[in-house]
């Protein structure tokens, strides 16, 4: 059984370790099989592309590469600090992701 990724698409995260330590960005994609996330503006790599209708000249394009999920920490919308994730049950039985520091919800209510 594979581990669950503690962040979701759209979360604002802080990179906690590595070359990009201290950078803040929004999660563009989550790759659960690789236990990785793609964060906007972080871990940019240059990729060679062939000529196509989208890139008529071809050449090199900068794009985000995946980071291991353990390197990022979600930023709590309530207290504004990077935090670990706890699971919490609401009165109606739903399970949500909660901030380990203040107990506020990390899940956006729809």
UniProtKB/Swiss-Prot annotation:
GO terms for biological process: translation. This is Large ribosomal subunit protein uL24. GO terms for molecular function: rRNA binding; structural constituent of ribosome. SMART domains: KOW. It holds the Pfam family KOW. Part of the 50S ribosomal subunit. The keyword Transcription regulation does not apply. GO terms for cellular component: ribonucleoprotein complex; ribosome. InterPro entries: KOW, Rib_uL2_dom2, Ribosomal_uL24, Ribosomal_uL24_CS, Ribosomal_uL24_KOW, Translation_prot_SH3-like_sf. Keywords: Ribonucleoprotein, Ribosomal protein, RNA-binding, rRNA-binding. Belongs to the universal ribosomal protein uL24 family. One of two assembly initiator proteins, it binds directly to the 5'-end of the 23S rRNA, where it nucleates assembly of the 50S subunit. One of the proteins that surrounds the polypeptide exit tunnel on the outside of the subunit.
């Amino acid at each position: 059984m594979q581990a669950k990724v503690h962040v979701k698409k759209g979360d604002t995260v802080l990179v906690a370790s590595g070359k990009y330590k201290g950078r803040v960005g929004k999660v563009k994609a989550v790759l659960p099989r690789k236990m990785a996330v793609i964060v906007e503006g972080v871990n940019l790599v240059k990729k060679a592309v062939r000529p196509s209708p989208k890139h008529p000249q071809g050449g090199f394009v900068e794009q985000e590469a995946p980071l291991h999920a353990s390197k990022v920490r979600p930023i709590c919308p309530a207290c504004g600090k990077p935090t670990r994730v706890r699971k919490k049950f609401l009165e109606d039985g739903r399970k949500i992701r909660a901030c380990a520091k203040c107990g506020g919800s990390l899940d956006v209510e729809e």
